[in-house]
Amino acid sequence: MAGETSLATLLRSMSPQLNDGEYVFCSLPDRSLLQDCEVLGSFREREGLTVILPRQQAERLGLGFDYVAAWITLNVHSALEAVGLTAAFAGALGKAGISCNGIAGYYHDHLFVGQADAGRAMQVLQQLAAGEEQ
């Protein structure tokens, strides 16, 4: 099934969902430290392997982190070639003073916001979906 490309439909249908838990970004030289670990996301950078993990797993492994995030999923099936969705949610959250780290999955966009900002971020995203001015 093809993802949605219409920005108006994407915004109206984004249906943001706050997932349970606290998540952290860690940088590792390689995957060897991640035995028996549920990695939510990863990206290879020049400096090392960035992984997104539940906070409890990072602490159990003794991994350092600087940022504790809440994870919000936009439940609309957005096409990877869709134009404007990232700009729309990043702009709305930025206008509200909320930092956002976005990751596009095959089906959905996933946003990581500071744990303390999760409630406000959900409110901003729900207002954006409803077409309300920020």
Where do the model's predicted regions map?
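Charge-rich, low-aromatic oligomerization/scaffolding segments with amphipathic character
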Residues: 43-46, 118-134
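Generic beta-strand structural signal
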Residues: 70-72, 96-98, 109
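Generic non-transmembrane alpha-helical segments
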Residues: 92, 96-98, 124-128
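Regulatory modules associated with amino-acid/nitrogen control
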Residues: 1-91, 126
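Structural preference for solvent-exposed beta-strand-turn elements
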Residues: 106-108, 117
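Helix N-cap motif at beta-to-alpha junctions
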Residues: 55-58, 114-119
